[in-house]
Amino acid sequence: MRAPHKDEIASHELPATPMDPALAANREGKIKVATIGLCGCWGCTLSFLDMDERLLPLLEKVTLLRSSLTDIKRIPERCAIGFVEGGVSSEENIETLEHFRENCDILISVGACAVWGGVPAMRNVFELKDCLAEAYVNSATAVPGAKAVVPFHPDIPRITTKVYPCHEVVKMDYFIPGCPPDGDAIFKVLDDLVNGRPFDLPSSINRYD
């Protein structure tokens, strides 16, 4: 299979989200960034907002493409930087992460779940069938007398036997730890990358005591 050119989009046979031509014209010269949340709580995505007013000058240099903030489902064109929150816990997560890896020059794990699995990975010490039974059959919220079944349908993404950190599925270029990471850490990484500076997160940013 031919490797995609840097300006092409690999999308696992799914069409990229169409982009408004007027919006595309306004993005010329800006660095394209995409974000995605996999198996996590989305707290790391909210940390982007903790950059507060520092976002404004960044947006003069950055165009945010696929993101929970834009509701674009697929990356519409190749991106320079991709931020991934959450671990990998389903076949859909795997496909989404591979799509990001194929279409982002730099891919960054954001937060504990993406870096090492986080809280969702606590289920890794149990068999998947036991986790599903606890959630759907033995749950305290189960309706008495109702038939308890584990849902299965082709349209429901199949759950993986364990939760994986992102780097065990695809190559990740950088890691921003934290649960969630501080907005200062995300800002430093993005600001340094956008301005072509090497970066090294100081330990003070990642200390919580």
UniProtKB/Swiss-Prot annotation:
Its cofactor is [4Fe-4S] cluster; [3Fe-4S] cluster; [2Fe-2S] cluster; FMN. It comes from the Bacteria. It comes from Cupriavidus necator (strain ATCC 17699 / DSM 428 / KCTC 22496 / NCIMB 10442 / H16 / Stanier 337) (Ralstonia eutropha). Its EC number is 1.12.1.2. Keywords: 2Fe-2S, 3Fe-4S, 4Fe-4S, Cytoplasm, Iron, Iron-sulfur, Metal-binding, NAD, Oxidoreductase, Plasmid. The gene is hoxY. It holds the Pfam family Oxidored_q6. This is NAD-reducing hydrogenase HoxS subunit delta. GO terms for molecular function: 2 iron, 2 sulfur cluster binding; 3 iron, 4 sulfur cluster binding; 4 iron, 4 sulfur cluster binding; hydrogen dehydrogenase activity; metal ion binding. Binds 2 [4Fe-4S] clusters. Binds 1 [3Fe-4S] cluster. It is an enzyme of class 1 (oxidoreductase). Transmembrane segments: none annotated.
